[in-house]
Amino acid sequence: MTQTTETQKTAATIEHATASEEMIEQMRSRVGVEIRRSATPQFVNQWNADAIRNYAIGTGDPNPIHYDEEYAAQTPFGTRIAPPNCLFSLGVGTLMATTFGMPGLHALYMGTEFWFERPIKLDDEIQSTLTYGPITTQDGASRFAGTRIVQTMDGEFVNQNGEHVAKSRDHVLRFDRHGGGRSKYKDLERAVYDDADLAAIDADIEKEVRRGSEPRYWEDVEVGEEIPWIVKGPLTVTDCIGFKVAWGFFPFCRPNRIGFEYRQAHPRAYTPNPYGVPDIPERVHWEDALAETIGIPAAFDYGPQRVSWFGHLLLNWVGDHGWIEYQNVQLREPILIGDTSWLQGKVERKWQEDGKNLVSLNLWAKDQRDRTTTTGSAHVSLPSRAES
């Protein structure tokens, strides 16, 4: 069959869409307005044992506090807790790609800030309220392609008891889909490994340290101290699929009849695949050719996947007696399929405030090329020897 349908024509045409002042002003008028959830509901409402386990598996985090109820019952939480960045399954990092009214502009997630107030415990029911945040623009070519528009989305999360669990702010870059020729990444070489390379990576993976049940006391932490790394990779499409299973189908992964109905309602959300079939823009995470059209030389990781890796790093370091108060992870470079990432951190400051023993951490990730692909920061609270 070679007949071109109207939907295919629309999908092909939209690849050339560009940002307009009308689009930008329309989005600015929505700042502070709650985002409609009808087309993109929460993937998880109740964090039962399956949901907690699946998110931990999806991020490659083996911490028993997410899996083992007998172990978790002995911690200060008294039960299993969900990985902190599981809030992505409630719409964080998702909705702006489908509800921000800029059809034809690619949405590239840049990072999220989280303010965590309390853990999500086994069987907690969490509801999210998401609102449009501020928008900034920058004329001229971005480091990826075309006009640069940075959008934000704010989230608030409440449990079944009416208690505030967390707040978030997403950052998403919107730009013309065709601009690959301007990319600074066009000469970035793909990773190729030999047996010795893989053995060295495996050895680094095995060096991962989880504090676990042994308290890390605030008094014992020193400014300038580096926290033990964790290694993610070499990244495979399987890793991305595993995370997607945990994160949820939305915004675009809607199979068969459900996908057909969404495409009929939102044809401009699709572009034709190499076989002429309208398909979702999320293909940039497994299809090299589509990634190239936005200026990235190969398929690459999911942004929320990478942010969640840092939740794994931080929980390893603070242990069962600590808590992540604030986490800010920003993506600086793409992590291509095949890349290996070393996630690290360093103590920048320690202080006491409002009865909490606080530590500020600088965060980053480097790949096998020694590129810094990710930067960030975190504030964590730790127990004090004076309190034990």
Regions found by a protein language model. Name each.
Residues 2-33, 111, 116-223, 229, ...:
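HotDog/MaoC-like acyl-thioester-processing domains
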Residues 135, 284-285, 290-292, 297-301, ...:
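Catalytic-pocket segment enriched in acidic/His residues
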